[in-house]
């Protein structure tokens, strides 16, 4: 009986996690890791118009922004917290 109950719990957890959720780094340094909202299909790193040194912002997007340094569609693909 315990085995059946454990099996049902595991199957329920697996089924609840079937909805794909993209994870991206977001914001400016220090970057934060978040689970993107539903509908977000891309992670991107975009340049902000700053001088003299460029500043980059990372985030979740429904499609690639018009200006981007990196745009991708897998978990955490827009770089680590220590990268530009």
Swiss-Prot record:
GO MF terms held by the record: toxin activity
Keywords, comma-separated and alphabetical: Disulfide bond, Secreted, Signal, Toxin
GO cellular component, one term: extracellular region
Coiled-coil stretches: none
Entry comment describing in which tissues the protein is expressed: Expressed by the venom gland.
Subcellular location: Secreted
Keyword field contains Transmembrane: no
Residues in the signal sequence: 1-21
Family that this chain belongs to: Belongs to the three-finger toxin family. Short-chain subfamily.
Protein name, entry field: Three-finger toxin MALT0070C
Source species: Micrurus altirostris (Uruguayan coral snake)
